[in-house]
Swiss-Prot record:
Residues 594-608 have a biased composition (Basic and acidic residues). One of its GO terms (cellular component) is nucleus. Induction: Circadian-regulation. Maximum levels of expression in the subjective morning. Up-regulated by a light pulse in the middle of the night via the phytochrome family of red/far-red light photoreceptors. Up-regulated following a temperature upshift during the dark period. Repressed by members of the TOC1/PRR1 family of clock genes. It comes from Arabidopsis thaliana (Mouse-ear cress). This is Protein LNK1.
């Protein structure tokens, strides 16, 4: 809006009201509510200098009526912004009669002219835009912002009543031109360009990154920062109490029920850490037991470079549910280093990481194992004396289980081959990578070792004795199996007819051999009837039996059985072959064999006569 328009408006209103002597300069509180504020140039000379003091007061209710008729009611709706309620009834003469205007206290925020009388109550719903230096008794504002206590003032950060500027509102920064306003709105600054704030703590609930709409909503909503800060303090106190009550216990309990103290809780006491006096007593007691048992078990378990001293190391003794922790007075080792049964080894001491100790837990006691290190002799005997001193009854170890298995096999299977170095390996088990001490007293260990040697010796002797018998039986079985496999391979290469021929031939050869062996009655043949003497008759009968078979049978017999000169041996071999290779007796059922026998009968008889003549 240009300055010319403002001047013309001011002249029009001034002439009208001066003529009736009803001119009035509006109070600075009568503003547009931030909607369309009218800025009047300060360069224009004030016209209220010509007006007397009588024009500064209301004389009658005539102007109130004209005001209501001319401008009407306020067209802009009011907003309930949490402040005092704004009265819409501006036509009452009681409120306007008491209204006075003093030129010395008139602010430059409103219409900057003494005779420029805006006759409408620019009621606003935003009390922060009101001039705090003006006295408002017309019901528009029941109180000023300066008089509001801090506990009840929602917007106390605009409390800058002692400051007077030529700008539109108090408390706002100097706005040079439209670009400054545009930059301020684009940046969405929640402080709205304020240079200095009296109550910066109350702005903590505003976010500088909030959008403009959210910022306006946060300013206009009925939100009380004091209550919000109080709620935040209450929440912080609750969190602090929770953290104090739930302070982490530095004594952490692991999965095995042990208590492990953290580095930050060194000053605190743990229930599993016993007094030093009890530890010293246990150490002395174990020292005495070690000295007594060392003399009895020294000849069984020896390590190269074993020291006679007693090394105070941290390990756990558990017997019948009673646990004792023997700790080094200089250094505490957490119980997590003591592994349970079936748990791999863990490094026990940081100074000697090569030595690994496993303390196995059981109902009857505990068993300690020492894995020696090849680095030095002292490290190899790291816990050997302790292990000898705390030997107690327990379940079988791996070595004991293997020994029992070997003994059982020795009793049940004396013919099996056992490793000859079994005794040497078990005898030198203390010098292997893992030294395992048997779970018995020294006397019992001596007896077990002697029994072990005897069992190993018996195994070796039984193996030597049974090796010859087993070898002979295996040779026989292997010979027969080899022959059978060879015969099977040959037969697989023949056709079905050849296989049937061989079967029938073997059957006839077996029958003839059986007849010769028993010496039964033989039918007389025409070819042998001319024989007179008994000896000739014997040979003639033998040849007759042989001639009952065909040439194929004889060739098969010569191929399969090498018949010796003695007939008795030949018959025995034939009988053995018959019993070892039984055949199905079907010689007469085969028509091909009968045809062959009839065709070869004429050829076999002359041949038999030639043989008998040669014998004579």
């Amino acid at each position: 809006m240009s300055d010319l328009y403002i001047h013309e408006l001011g002249d029009y209103l001034s002439d009208e009201f001066h003529g009736n002597d009803d001119g009035i300069v509006p109070d600075s509180a009568y503003e547009d509510g931030g909607q369309f504020p009218i800025l009047v140039s300060n360069r224009k000379k004030r016209r209220n200098d010509d007006m007397g003091s009588g024009t500064n007061h209301l004389k009658s209710n005539t102007f109130i009526k004209r005001e209501a008729n001319m401008l009407g009611k306020n067209p802009w709706p009011e907003k309930d912004s949490g402040g005092s309620s704004v009265s819409r009834d501006t036509g009452t003469g009681k409120d306007v009669q008491d209204m006075t205007l003093e030129d010395t206290n008139t602010s430059d925020h409103g219409f900057n002219g003494g005779h420029v009388d805006v006759v409408e109550n620019f009621s606003t719903g935003d009390p922060m835009l009101c001039d705090t230096s003006a006295a408002t008794n017309d019901g528009v504002y029941n109180y000023s912002l300066n008089s509001i206590p801090d506990a009840e003032n929602d917007l106390s950060f605009f409390d800058n009543g002692d400051k007077e500027k030529n700008d539109l509102f108090y408390g706002w920064g100097d706005i040079g031109n439209f670009e400054d306003v545009d930059n301020m709105l684009r940046s969405c600054d929640s402080t709205f360009g304020l240079d200095s704030l009296n109550n910066e703590g109350d702005l903590g609930w505003f976010s500088s990154a909030q959008p403009n709409e959210e910022t306006a909503g946060a300013m206009t909503d009925d939100l009380k920062p004091d209550k919000m800060l109080e709620n935040q303090r209450t929440a912080m106190l609750q969190v602090e109490d929770f953290l104090n009550n739930s302070e982490p216990n530095h004594a952490v309990e692991d999965e095995y029920g042990y208590t492990i103290e953290d580095d930050s809780a060194q000053g605190k006491s743990s229930q599993n850490v016993f007094d030093t006096s009890l530890q010293k007593k246990d150490i002395l007691m174990l020292d005495v037991e070690a000295n007594l048992e060392k003399k009895q078990t020294d000849h069984l378990h020896h390590l190269d470079g074993k020291s006679d001293g007693f090394s105070e190391n941290s390990f756990t003794l558990q017997h019948s549910g009673i646990s004792r922790e023997i700790m080094d007075t200089n250094q505490y080792y957490p119980p997590s280093a003591f592994q349970q049964r079936d748990v791999p080894y863990s490094h026990f001491n940081c100074e000697q990481p090569s030595v690994q100790v496993s303390a196995c837990e059981s109902k009857s006691g505990i068993k300690s194992e020492n894995k020696p290190s090849p680095s030095s002799a002292s490290n190899e005997s790291y816990t050997s004396n302790h292990a000898q001193s705390i030997e107690s009854l327990q379940g079988p170890t791996v070595d004991d289980r293997f020994r029992k298995v070997f003994e059982t096999r020795a009793n049940l299977l004396p013919g099996q081959d056992m490793p000859p170095s079994f005794a040497a390996n078990t005898k030198k088990s203390s010098k292997t990578d893992s030294m395992v001490f048997p779970d018995a007293a020294p006397i019992q260990k001596i007896g077990l070792e002697n029994d072990h040697r005897k069992a190993a010796t018996e195994l070796e002797t039984s193996n030597m004795q049974g090796s010859s018998c087993v070898s002979s039986v295996v040779d026989d079985i292997s010979l027969e199996a080899t022959s059978f496999r060879q015969l099977q391979q040959v037969i697989e290469q023949l056709d079905v007819r050849t296989k049937l021929c061989i079967r029938d031939s073997l059957y006839r050869l077996a029958k003839s051999a059986e007849q010769r062996h028993h010496g039964g009655n033989r039918p007389e043949k025409g070819a042998g009837s001319h024989l007179v003497t008994g000896e000739a008759d014997k040979y003639a009968g033998f040849m007759d039996i042989e001639t009952d078979t065909n040439p194929i049978d004889r060739s098969i017999a010569h191929l399969l059985f090498h018949r010796p000169s003695d007939s008795s041996l030949s018959s025995d071999n034939n009988v053995l072959s018959y019993k070892s290779h039984p055949m199905i007796p079907q010689p007469n059922s085969s028509p091909s064999l009968r045809i062959e026998k009839q065709e070869e009968t004429t050829e076999l008889r002359p041949e038999a006569e030639v043989v008998t003549s040669d014998n004579n």
